Amino acid sequence: MYGRVAITALAALSLGAASPPPEHGGWIDNTPETLAALAKSCKGKDGWADPAPPSHIYGNTWYVGTCGITVLLVNTKAGNILIDGGVPEATPMVAASLAKAGFSMRDVRWIVHSHEHFDHVGDLAELKRMSGAKVAALAPAAAVLRSGKPDPSDPQYDLLIAKPMAPVTVDRVLRSGDTIRLGGTVLTARATLAHSAGSTSWTWQSCEFRVCRTMTYADSSSTISADGYRFTDHPQRIAAVRRGLEVMSALPCGILMTPHPSASGMFERMATGQLFDPQACGAYAKSAVARFADRLATETGTAAPKPVQ
């Protein structure tokens, strides 16, 4: 068993004979107070290396990232899965959060990611070294991880090239729909190629006291770029973005989490107990569709003029 969660007497009484959450770990229960602590600690801060306290989200899923970058730990009876890593400066913070939550880096068996930009995978080589875990990624992301260099076709290439990464050995190349199976937990990878060529969203089931939720880690939906890049010069990229957002909108959805917490109001939803929302993924993707349409309209000169203030 890889850690135990504390169960309050009140929760045990209210749930009668229900079994405790299976095999999930650590010393922090997901009470309103602990969920609110993360939002309070990060209020006014969203730096990629701003330290944040670990937080138990639901069932076997934990937040062990920083104020600005999500890192998730999924705990199983056969070891743990880490989703995303962060910038190199955040590596000791992620390791410390795991320890504070009652986990060990040595128990991480797999490392996967959302997309292949340095703010989310810049420290994967070191996390792999520390844990001995295997790394899995979609083919476009695997190429970037193995080389440590960004994809030249990435809209953000001119920004990313200034931030080279330590190369990472990729142990398994995934296709959309493939799964990572560990200790009875199944993570499903889906290519949602809006933000990058290797953008990956993940879904899995997490249960507490016989109440199971779909956990949905939807990748970044933004279509930002380096100065001078025009999506309208790259019709294949436009098609990939539209298809990616379409897939994202249709993801099985229960508890939405995103690589940048602020992109989905993640901390605020945790603090107010409003995490479960089957419509959240569709709304998240819909807003991105509108923003991308605005971007294309601006590029083609067909954007509606802004009202005079």
Report each predicted region and the residues it spans:
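Divalent metal-coordination and catalytic microenvironments
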Residues: N60, V74, D84, V94, ...
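Bacterial N-terminal signal peptides that target proteins for export
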Residues: M1-I7
